[in-house]
């Protein structure tokens, strides 16, 4: 993912906020945890995630994003909403590092599905289960923000067009906002 704006900053400086994309959010886990039933395995994919009973997450190890990451709020909401007590939490700095740890079976993790490109297609298919949870979002908007009065407006508009026309369409599981 390029980034996300999950909170609109409250400040004296007027901002222009332009939505540019929507990215899929998934809970991913190594197949060894058995979160997706055998009869659902054939169809389980980032395009067809399994609706998971949150109780199955009790006492599992988690890969947690740092508080500065937009996914941290989703992680905290999940813990609070379902009363989940992780067996352990590994806090990572980079979501792709967390995905590699998840792939090795060290925990379950919320991700933007766009980062799945960082592991092989074979690992995506054979190693990981893909889930969504009731009452939690399965996507999030991404926006670009800039100061209303800036001399860089032509450059910003050009950058937004490049993002929408060249970069975002090449990201997995991410939709351009018209």
Predicted features, each with a name:
Residues 1-31, 36-40, 119, 129:
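Short beta-strand-centered segments that line the small-molecule binding cleft or hinge
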Residues 4, 68-130:
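Hydrophobic hinge/microswitch elements
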Residues 15-16, 47, 51, 129-133:
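Short beta-strand/turn micro-motifs at beta-sheet edges
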Residues 18, 55, 99-100:
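Alpha-helical segments flanking ligand/cofactor-binding loops in enzyme cores
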Residues 23, 97, 140:
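Conserved sugar-transfer catalytic core signal across GT-A, GT-B, and GT-C glycosyltransferases
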Residues 35-39, 43-82, 152-160, 170-176:
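Secondary-structure junction motif
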Residues 129-173:
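A late-sequence structural motif
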């Amino acid at each position: 993912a390029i980034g996300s704006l999950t909170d609109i900053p409250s400040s004296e400086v007027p901002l222009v906020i332009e939505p540019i994309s929507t990215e899929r959010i998934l809970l991913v886990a190594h197949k060894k945890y058995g979160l997706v039933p055998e009869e659902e395995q054939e169809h389980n994919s980032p395009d067809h995630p399994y609706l998971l009973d949150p109780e199955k997450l009790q006492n599992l190890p988690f890969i947690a994003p740092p508080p500065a990451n937009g996914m941290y709020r989703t992680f905290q909401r999940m813990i609070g909403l379902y009363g989940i007590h992780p067996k352990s939490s590994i806090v990572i700095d980079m979501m792709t590092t967390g995905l590699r740890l998840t792939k090795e079976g060290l925990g379950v993790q919320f991700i933007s599905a766009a980062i799945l490109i960082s592991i092989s297609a074979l690992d995506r298919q054979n190693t990981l289960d893909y889930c969504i949870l009731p009452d939690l979002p399965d996507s999030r908007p991404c926006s670009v923000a800039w100061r209303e009065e800036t001399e860089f407006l032509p450059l910003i508009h050009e950058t937004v067009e490049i993002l929408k026309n060249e970069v975002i369409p090449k990201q997995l599981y991410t939709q351009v906002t018209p």
